[in-house]
């Protein structure tokens, strides 16, 4: 695997990580990914909520959480209540409903700022991958393992890959901003 392919692979992982980070940012709509970081005390063991309940979106602003084990509905509700989502769960038998409140303009701007920060974190990670790969190429040229022309060609390829990945992160950010600001 060439150095450029390795860098591409690492950068692709960074883009996926950035997408994951974006999925945790609230928009005006219900999104099951909002519950990804929540763990339930399931018979004494902290367990991800996805492993103990099914999560659905019956309406655009409502999430429904149905525990697989009905006796654990209380534990799931407690985990949702104690989470940092800022949403109060409503229990209806074994089904727990989370209704997303309308976001205020100030809140939307905060979330846009948060999204920009996560996008910048992704870009910094991409630049770090580029820097490490560039150092490896420069060292190989200096040690005579490859010619200067090949080193220059690899650096140009690396710059193209880096630009396309940062553009992809910018596109993801634009999409997320539109989602957040949509009323």
UniProtKB/Swiss-Prot annotation:
The subcellular localization recorded is: Cytoplasm
Single GO molecular function: ribosomal large subunit binding
GO terms in the biological process aspect are: translational termination
Q: Which domain of life is it from?
A: Bacteria
Whether Acyltransferase counts among this entry's keywords is no
Q: Which UniProt keywords apply?
A: Cytoplasm, Protein biosynthesis
Q: Which is a Pfam family this sequence falls into?
A: RRF
* Keyword Protein biosynthesis included in the entry's annotation: yes
An example GO CC term for this entry is:
cytoplasm
Family classification? Belongs to the RRF family.
What is known about what this protein does?
A: Responsible for the release of ribosomes from messenger RNA at the termination of protein biosynthesis. May increase the efficiency of translation by recycling ribosomes from one round of translation to another.
Against PANTHER family, the record matches this protein to:
MITOCHONDRIAL RIBOSOME RECYCLING FACTOR PSEUDO 1, RIBOSOME RECYCLING FACTOR
Q: What is this protein called?
A: Ribosome-recycling factor
